[in-house]
A protein has these predicted regions:
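Positively charged n-region of N-terminal signal peptides that target proteins for export
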Residues: 1-4
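Bacterial N-terminal signal peptides
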Residues: 6-16
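Carbohydrate-active catalytic/glycan-binding domains of CAZyme proteins
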Residues: 18-112
């Protein structure tokens, strides 16, 4: 009896059309920040969004961006506009922006 039920179940499953859709991969072109900017951090200050991201040894300037809509970003400046000091030339990543309302200052922390 169990064998008969098993055969009936297999037959029913075989008769049911299984539609398998091929998985297609499409390239999504929607960069949040221009260029190679891993580990971004974003904060909102008075209706504007501010962002920073990991730099690298080839460009250790630590860029700062701002946006009003989280889509269109403007490069504002760099933490080190004249080039990073020797102590900050490499191994800095995963920044974090923090805003102190009382002082009206933005702090930028990096993992080293």
């Amino acid at each position: 009896m169990k064998r008969l039920l098993f055969v009936i179940l297999l037959t029913i499953m075989g008769c049911c059309g299984v539609h398998v859709q091929a998985v297609g991969y499409e390239k999504i072109i929607n960069p949040v920040l221009p260029g190679d900017r891993p580990d971004p951090t974003v904060i909102e200050i008075n209706g504007e969004y501010w962002a920073a991201a990991t730099s690298n040894e080839w460009s250790p300037l630590f860029p700062i961006f701002k946006s009003k809509d989280l889509v269109n970003w403007e490069l504002v400046n760099y933490v080190f506009p004249d080039g990073a000091p020797d102590w900050a030339l490499n191994n800095f990543w995963a920044p974090e922006l923090s805003y102190d309302e009382k002082q009206g200052k933005v702090y930028l922390y990096y993992t080293a």
